[in-house]
């Protein structure tokens, strides 16, 4: 079903599909190729009724340490108009939108650093379990760019609450797994060695549920959470991101 990928490790276990971010040498930083490969997997899942649960994880020491920062200035240098960077931002939004709207249940298995784009990918999953040693951060404002990746801001505010998200974004402070659970960014915190067992406790009953009921329930939850507004909110994200990175590139000259 799935081709060989350069940035993902995909394991088909019948009703469960495991998708592992596989750039451990970069902390699984998200680049354009990873986005393209994620989008290919997600679109294939839209047409596959046999998979009931997708588990998203990261190889190595971290789930994901954010977007590939080296890619942004490289794209601007190659295309000063910013069109390639806008295309990258639009691709990130498509990945997150498709992830949130899949008919099957998605589970994020989190460990190590869950930063920036990594946190964005995680919050678009239905269920999230994290190791008690995992660390979270939204560093964008501290880096001089808006929190534009993937249209994450509305989703994060809906999941964790507007007041806390305001604090975490403006201060760019790191927070631990206990705080992430308090904010409902994590549904459960377990020792790192128990992550697979925790995922299995969720996945096993889910794959026995009626798939139509699961699909309708997810649609109802997404509508309640304002998921239909993500496209509207993220309409501005690529423009903001391009402008911010362009300003940073100009200031460095």
Go through each PLM region and give its residues.
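Short acidic-hydrophobic, aromatic-tinged amphipathic segments that line or gate anion-handling sites
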Residues: 129-130, 188-195
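CoA-thioester-processing core
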Residues: 95, 99, 115-169, 198, ...
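Conserved CoA-thioester-binding segment of acyl-CoA-metabolizing enzymes
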Residues: 1-59
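Glycine- (often His-adjacent) and acidic-residue-rich active-site loop
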Residues: 58-95, 142-144, 228
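A short, small-residue-rich loop immediately preceding and capping a beta-strand
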Residues: 104-113
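Well-ordered beta-strand positions
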Residues: 127, 167, 171-173, 179, ...
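Hydrophobic/aromatic residues within transmembrane alpha-helices
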Residues: 19, 56, 68, 121-123, ...
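C-terminal alpha-helix plus adjacent terminal tail
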Residues: 1-17, 172-178, 193, 197, ...
């Amino acid at each position: 079903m799935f081709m060989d990928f350069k940035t993902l490790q995909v394991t088909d276990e019948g009703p469960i599909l495991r998708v592992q971010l596989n750039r451990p040498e970069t902390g699984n930083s998200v680049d354009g190729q990873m986005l393209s490969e994620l989008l290919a997997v997600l679109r294939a899942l839209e047409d596959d009724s046999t998979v009931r649960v997708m588990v998203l994880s990261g190889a190595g020491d971290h789930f994901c340490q954010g977007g590939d920062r080296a890619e942004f200035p490289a794209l601007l240098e190659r295309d000063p108009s910013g069109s390639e960077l806008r295309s990258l931002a639009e691709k990130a939004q498509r990945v997150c939108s498709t992830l949130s709207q899949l008919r099957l249940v998605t589970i994020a298995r989190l460990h190590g650093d869950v930063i920036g784009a990594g946190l964005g990918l995680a919050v678009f999953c239905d269920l999230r379990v994290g190791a008690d040693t995992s660390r979270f951060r939204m560093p964008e404002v501290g880096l001089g760019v808006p929190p534009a990746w993937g249209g994450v801001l509305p989703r994060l505010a809906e999941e964790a609450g507007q007041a806390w998200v305001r604090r975490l974004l403006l201060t760019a402070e790191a927070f631990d797994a206990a705080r992430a659970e308090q904010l409902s960014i994590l549904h459960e915190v377990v020792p790192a060695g128990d992550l697979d067992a925790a995922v299995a406790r969720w996945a096993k009953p889910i794959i026995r549920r009626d798939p139509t009921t699961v699909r309708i329930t997810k649609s109802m939850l997404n509508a309640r959470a304002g998921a239909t507004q993500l496209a509207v909110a993220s309409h501005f994200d690529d423009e903001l991101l391009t402008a911010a990175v362009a300003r940073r590139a100009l200031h460095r000259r």
